[in-house]
Amino acid sequence: MLTAGGLAPCLSSAVGGLIERYTAVAPDVRVIAYRNGYAGLLKGDSVEVTAQVRANAHRLHAFGGTPIGNSRVKLTNVKDCVKRGLVHEGQDPLHVAAEQLSRDGVDVLHTIGGDDTNVTAADLAAYLRSNGYELTVVGLPKTIDNDVVPIKQSLGAWTAAEQGALYARNIIAEHSSNPRMLIVHEVMGRNCGWLTAATALAHHGWVQQARFAEWLENSAATWDVHAVFVPERPFGIADEAKRLRAIMDEHDCVNLFISEGAGVSEIVAAMEQAGEEVPRDPFGHVQLDKINPGQWFAKQFAAALGADKVLVQKSGYFSRSAAANRADLDLIRQCTDYAVDAALRGESGVVGQDEERGDELRAIEFDRIAGGKKFDVTAPWFTELLREIGQA
């Protein structure tokens, strides 16, 4: 097994769940873990799941992070693998990985990651098959963006929304630290606004239930979210600024929740026009943490709102590093149990609720897995949220 990509509140629990299931139904199966994802596979860095590890596997459900380490490695990006010292010049990373799996006697590979991780696993399985080595690959869908096609709910996303709302609750208390305060809460989500919307909904729900004194800065109106911006919902800055200026004038603060993917096309276009290099990761994705969408939004709104102070905060690392909540733990258990059972049947795929098959939990074919699933901004819970905060 291996975990790969960024963290999510499911990795530790998923590793624990896989170990527990194998111990329960196939205790004689040898289980190893590659450290630091595909980097460990390329370097032959693996550890045995011992009897002691099996006995303590249940403890992994209480923690965030991953017990076996992660990395962002694309096996088909030869140049990057060579640059990072994972393979030598002239070597094919797919061949190196295949040889390592063969040497280790691996006939089932469990990958826990996003669409890139699982598509890479599919590439590896296809390469092995073409070279006469059969490998069953069973993936688990990890991404807090909840943007994997055709999977209804990715592991860890519910927890990330809950934790992002907790983060926002404390950050938004800063509205009382300065007159005319603009707070921008930047939420992870490259191409999909689901996490931003779900985080805003969770925070708004808390505001509705909280018992405020309704005195000056301690009021629902000053603690609530005032606007939610996601990539899938275009908006006019001038129109929004006019609406938000009225909120600033009345309540002395404005709290925005924005997806890190909102406004990226405009930012990238401006950088390219200025002749600046756009930073990208090994998968070709724009490195959002280096172009700072939150700062861009703050700059667009600050003057128009007459803000005296601007605070931009990112909840991503806080929310993605949490231990899984009860809802995610239940989903993780269903998926890890199914993943092991599928592996023992020799059935490859990514385990999840298949939206195109009536939300059936199954091993979804790799050629149907893709990233970039769009958030449905017509979802009733989201349109109701926008209506309640005056943004509809």
Outline where the language-model segments fall:
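Short, ordered loop/turn segments at secondary-structure junctions
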Residues: A4-G6, Y34-A39, R72-V73, G114-D115, ...
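Short glycine/serine/threonine-rich phosphate/pyrophosphate-binding segments
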Residues: A8-L18, L41-L42, T76, D92-H95, ...
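Glycine/threonine-rich beta-strand-loop-alpha-helix active-site module
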Residues: I19-V53, A122, A126-I171
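Glycine-rich nucleotide/cofactor/substrate-binding loop typically near the N-terminus or early
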Residues: Y22, P27-D104
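Accessory alpha-helical/coil subdomains and C-terminal extensions
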Residues: E99-Q100, D104, T111-G113, V119-D123, ...
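C-terminal non-catalytic interaction/assembly regions of soluble proteins
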Residues: G263-A392
